[in-house]
């Protein structure tokens, strides 16, 4: 019985982390209201978290909760679609390339930074 309660409390704690992270991510996304910087900074945060090898609770809170609601593929792709639909093909292509390249670069750089920081505090 005790282990069943322990498992249930861990699940509730994960749900709590998910809810709080999601709310904070959604509020910040709403306040920034700029798909490009939201997606780039979200990718950078993901890179840092993974590079640091943060604990599972921190990853659950930040990766699934916060970044899951903070970054916004659907809003961004709607902007791309509207540009294509209205004949701004080069702007749409530029938006696609800048977000993909920017997001990949931000994640790669912050992953590397996270690994360096981790090695400073936790030598191998």
UniProtKB/Swiss-Prot annotation:
Regulation affecting activity: Na(+) is not transported, but it plays an essential structural role and its presence is essential for fluoride channel function.
GO MF entries: fluoride channel activity; metal ion binding
InterPro entries for this protein: FluC
Membrane topology summary: Multi-pass membrane protein
Subcellular location(s) per record: Cell inner membrane
Catalytic activity: fluoride(in) = fluoride(out)
Sorted UniProt keywords: Cell inner membrane, Cell membrane, Ion channel, Ion transport, Membrane, Metal-binding, Sodium, Transmembrane, Transmembrane helix, Transport
Record field: transmembrane: 7-27, 32-52, 58-78, 93-113
Primary subcellular site in the record, as a coarse category: membrane
CC terms in the record's Gene Ontology section: plasma membrane
Domain of life according to the entry: Bacteria
Function of the protein: Fluoride-specific ion channel. Important for reducing fluoride concentration in the cell, thus reducing its toxicity.
Protein's name in the database: Fluoride-specific ion channel FluC 1
Organism: Prochlorococcus marinus (strain SARG / CCMP1375 / SS120)
Organism lineage string: Bacteria, Bacillati, Cyanobacteriota, Cyanophyceae, Synechococcales
């Amino acid at each position: 019985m005790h282990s069943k309660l322990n498992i249930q409390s861990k699940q509730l704690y994960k749900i709590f982390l998910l809810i709080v992270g999601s709310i904070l991510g959604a509020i910040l996304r709403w306040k920034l209201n700029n798909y490009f910087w939201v997606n780039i900074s979200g990718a950078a945060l993901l890179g840092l978290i993974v590079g640091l090898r943060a604990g599972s609770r921190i990853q659950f809170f930040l990766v699934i909760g916060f970044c899951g609601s903070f970054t916004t593929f659907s809003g961004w792709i709607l902007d791309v679609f509207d540009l294509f639909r209205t004949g701004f093909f080069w702007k749409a292509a530029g938006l696609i390339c800048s977000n993909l390249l920017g997001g990949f670069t931000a994640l790669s750089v912050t992953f590397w930074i996270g690994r360096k920081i981790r090695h400073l505090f936790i030598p191998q």
